Amino acid sequence: AAREIAKQIGIPYYVFDCSKEYEKIVLENFKEEYLSGRTPNPCIRCNSMIKFDVLPYLAKKAGLEFDKFATGHYANIEYDAEKARYILKKGINSKKDQSYFLYKLKQKQLENIILPLGKYEKSEIRKIAKENGLAVYDKPDSQDFYNGDYNELLEVKSKKGNIVDISGNILG
């Protein structure tokens, strides 16, 4: 879909293979945290370490020049001149706000990012896409960081056994 949109609006489309970094930084960490009994949020790690760090680095390394890096996150970034720092703010659409997923971004990252969707409701974006003939106007929302089988990712094998309560009583 992204390739089609880029062609449709007349901008270059590039692909960078970040799969090794994603495997090491996001998936391995997710697996370690999950199997240690914690509930990781891989999107936060992916945003701060892959999307806004590895990806811009690879683009610049490939000779692409850009002042700002734009994504489709529903959040806003404002510059506070008094404090001389960038502030991450919620998007206006409280149901689709994604500022939480970006909270680990550093000042240098925030300085180089544009989040054009943060000032719109999702329905407005879909309407704009439809009016401009973009095929993604009715595309379902993406929700997951991994499109495979979680058991395979976590290397969890089902085991036969009794179902027990917290006191150790066999329930079935």
Task: Give names to the regions the model predicted.
Residues 1-103, 124:
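ATP-dependent adenylation/nucleotidyltransferase module used to activate substrates
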